[in-house]
Amino acid sequence: MTTIDLNCDLGESFGAYKMGNDDKILPFVSSINVACGFHAGDPSVMRQTVEKAMQHNVAIGAHPGFPDLIGFGRRNMNVSASEIYDYVLYQIGALDAFVKAAGGKMQHVKPHGALYNMAATNPEIADAIAKAIYHINPSLLLYGLANSEAFIQAAEKYNITLVQEAFADRTYKQDGTLTSRTEENALIKNEEEAIKQVLQMVKEGYVNSVNGEKVAVQAQTICLHGDGEKAVQFAKRIYRTFEHNGISICAPK
């Protein structure tokens, strides 16, 4: 039986601001990426998100991003590899404290937004992220963009397991990278098209690029975004589509 992980970015609320549909999405995913306070989230939200994930038996990962609350971590920052190492180490450590306090165990690390996209094409940034993971806990998995040589090489260098990720509702360029969110066609807004893309990736191992060419994608985890208007409905659709097609949903081991 084909097996796939469904992951979602959660814990993005902070202070008086509520983001996402965390409670309603948790039953339909197998792993979550928890914002660690730099691009979103706050200490109370981190604790609450960890506790809810454990109640649903969902694998927990840190979702470190750039210190850019106003830009939601989606703007590139011109910082050194050393600074990125510090940012990532700090955020992993913060979430790990909440996970341990709740009696759980962190499974993975997935960079957020601009940090993720920059790491996918910049070996120096990917190396800094992998090094931070290695120094805090080398058994943590690294979620990174499928086919990214930067992520692959960094994981190999530090002997970290890379879980190759694809996106349900994002379009792809010919080189296998994601279309920038600054472009109008970055998101797939039609549910049927997104479902078709996910099944192609999981069952057939490819995705159609924005240019119409087939791009090989060997995904081990699929990302759902939890902050969209129809996020919960979409999560249910993918979950049930996988069940109907005999695809087992579970976190990576």
UniProtKB/Swiss-Prot annotation:
One of its GO terms (biological process) is carbohydrate metabolic process. Forms a complex composed of PxpA, PxpB and PxpC. Pfam families: LamB_YcsF (PF03746). GO terms for molecular function: 5-oxoprolinase (ATP-hydrolyzing) activity; ATP binding. Belongs to the LamB/PxpA family. InterPro entries: Glyco_hydro/deAcase_b/a-brl, LamB/YcsF/PxpA-like. The keyword Nucleus does not apply. It is an enzyme of class 3 (hydrolase). Its EC number is 3.5.2.9. Catalyzes the cleavage of 5-oxoproline to form L-glutamate coupled to the hydrolysis of ATP to ADP and inorganic phosphate. It catalyses: 5-oxo-L-proline + ATP + 2 H2O = L-glutamate + ADP + phosphate + H(+). Disulfide bonds: none annotated. This is 5-oxoprolinase subunit A. It comes from Bacillus thuringiensis subsp. konkukian (strain 97-27). Keywords: ATP-binding, Hydrolase, Nucleotide-binding. The keyword Hydrolase applies.
